Amino acid sequence: MSGPILIFDSGIGGLSILDEIRKVMPQQSCCYLFDNARLPYGELEESELISGCVSLIIEQAMRINAGIVVVACNSASTLVLTTLREQLSIPVVGVVPAIKPAAKISKRRHIGLLATPGTIKRPYTKQLIDAFAEDCRVELFGSSELVMLAEAKLAGTAVDMQKLELLLAPIRTSELDTLVLGCTHFPVLATEIKQSLGQSIILLDSGKAVADRVLSLLKGNGLPKTASNKVVDYSAVFTTDDIAQGLKKRLVEEGFTSIEPHSSTNLR
């Protein structure tokens, strides 16, 4: 049997990726690691993000003898995938903003990317747009505050619609017909975003594509096996800081049976 999937994000927005994975692999063991001590990632310096993420993910992957790592964070994926793939012997899957499918379906040839400021400014994002949406008008909208709104919603707090309306105001005045949710936190707010922008707008995220990629890898023959002497809770959550009771409740509802700290000297 291959080891559990290790899903990583700065917060619990990566649960949107986990949900898609469970749709296609309901019996697959998963562990979740989130670096809530440094949330939100979209405002971190690149050097800090890279050094912290790489050490954190590698340590936890080795600790649980993971069979595959999913970096369920756009901000991190744009920076750390190459290094992780060089240092880990297991597959590493990242999240790519759904620019390509958005360009294919936009009738107006006018799309938007809603992401963290970090993802918006990365050269990789521009490369995606140049490669797959050259014939489209692409508008970029960056927000870290939406990340915290999503975190609050997952903890059981009602979404502040007045604040959401203010944050989405630049999009509402645009004539785009397709909006890419380029942060794994943002699908959590999909209902509220549609309520604000109108039901006709098409929202796209990368969750299904990531799940399909993971399934494809698990069906292959190259995944390492867990050592027989390794014992791990296959439904564990690991955190880098304390979490609110509301978030703990949500994680239990997601089926996780233990929540414990990740101990590391390299987090800060």
From Swiss-Prot:
Gene Ontology process terms (BP): cell wall organization; peptidoglycan biosynthetic process; regulation of cell shape
Binding site residues for substrate: 9-10, 41-42, 74-75, 184-185
Listed InterPro entries: Asp/Glu/hydantoin_racemase, Asp/Glu_race, Asp/Glu_racemase_AS_1, Asp/Glu_racemase_AS_2, Glu_race
Protein's pathway: Cell wall biogenesis; peptidoglycan biosynthesis
NCBIfam families assigned to the protein according to its UniProt record, in alphabetical order: glut_race
Function (record text): Provides the (R)-glutamate required for cell wall biosynthesis.
Record's protein name: Glutamate racemase
